[in-house]
Amino acid sequence: GQQVRELLKEAWSYTPEHGWTHLPDMPYAIAAAPTPAPVSGNGVIYLLGGDDGSGKKYTPQTNPGFNNQSLCLDTADMTWHDAGPIAAPRAVLPCCAWQGRFAAVNGELKPGRRSPEVWSISLP
């Protein structure tokens, strides 16, 4: 059957001290981007790839893959910006700080197809 789901543009942050805080809405919906989202040394939060919903018209067998664009939220002025394309679009994958960079491990290339790759990401 046809997938029924709604991707949201909402963005939220959580701290134990303050609970949930609503951030400015993203310019377009993104789900399943690498988590936790990488944060640069100057406080910019990055959403790298993920599912933008454009593949929902496809079956898992014909889906071309996930979004290769990235967004960033500049926490100094709380505005979203286009952060450009990424080399390896993925969704549903962990991301962690590693040796001064970020490691994005495995993830889905397209629905139902996992990647064995590990990517190292350097942020400005």
Language-model-detected regions and their locations in the chain:
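Kelch-like beta-propeller repeat domains
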Residues: 1-124
